[in-house]
Swiss-Prot record:
It is found in: Periplasm. This is Curli assembly protein CsgC. Keywords: Chaperone, Periplasm, Signal. Gene3D superfamilies: 2.60.40.2420. The keyword Chaperone applies. NCBIfam families: PRK10102.1.
Length: 108
């Protein structure tokens, strides 16, 4: 049992903290790494709606510490019922570490 807990604690993970007020969603991508990393962080958001499609991309290199949740950004998005929005977060050190996660995890 303790081995399973230790393995879970050591794994790298990306999560999204999300709050909603009406059509406004606030999305905070968060990463926890098992080892410190100088990583390339990319956030891509894609919106399809009645007014067409838009893409926004942010890239930066960050020094990320180990074993603590790090909030990488804060995005506020107005999503109506006609819109489809996805946010993809990628964290990579260009070698052995490559994490990618999409929000929402299933299609809206």
């Amino acid at each position: 049992m303790h081995t399973l807990l230790l393995l879970a604690a050591l794994s790298n993970q990306i999560t999204f903290i999300t709050t909603q007020q009406g059509d406004i969603y606030t999305v905070i991508p968060q990463v926890i790494l098992s080892e410190p990393c100088v990583c390339q962080v990319q956030i891509l958001s894609v919106r399809n709606g009645t007014w067409g499609q838009s893409h926004t991309q942010q890239k930066q290199t960050l020094s990320l510490p180990a074993n603590q949740p790090i909030e990488l950004s804060r995005l506020s998005v107005n999503i109506s019922s006609e819109d489809s929005v996805k946010i993809i977060l990628t964290v990579s050190n260009g070698q052995s570490l490559h994490l990618s996660q999409q929000w929402p995890s299933s299609a809206r």
